Amino acid sequence: MIRIDTPENIYAVFMMRNDSPDELDVIPRVLPSQVHGDNIIHIHDDNAMSYVLPERPKADGLLLTTAKVSASIRVADCAPVMIYGEDWVMILHSGFKGTVLNISRKGLELVKRNYGDDSVKEAHAWIGPCIGRDDYERDANEEWSIRGMNEFHRENYDVKDEKVYFDLSGEIESQLIDSGMKSENVTVTGINTYTNHECYSYRRGDVKERMTLYARIKKGLPV
């Protein structure tokens, strides 16, 4: 388990192989049905209970601004991203398609609408374990690969022998900075899920198992 360094008011962890998120369910939890898109749900006091398990709303991101519920996403090679301020936290499932769609930028636009431009300038971000550049190979002529080469910064992919290798965490970092975050406020774990056997990896054969990014706003709740 990785405990993420956050303000005192926010509790966040990343659950690795053999860690169980069930032990963290001290309050109802929101776990979306992830569809490799860019839909983000704002979870606040008025709507929080309508989204908790066993409900599974279709989304790849959650902006949490209430202490009534916790938020989580599940990954195995896709990048878990957390962006947070003093009293809000956003978690994103940024797989290849989500990164091509720039879900990080969309998330920060949602934060700006709710908290103003300065909220993004002062925010912090954490990019968790995901598949590494050397191990994420795609056919260069495939539709989404072409879209990726059009959308990714050139330094974040390589083309070799009709294959393209994408740097997910590098591109997400670039997107966050382009969207107004300070580079010194973006933390990249650099853990490659494909080569690190403490992680689940879909490409390595973990078809069903997933790791969990979990966050909640404490406000006096037990940790």
Which ranges hold each PLM region?
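Active-site microenvironment for binding and transforming phosphate-containing groups
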Residues: 1-223
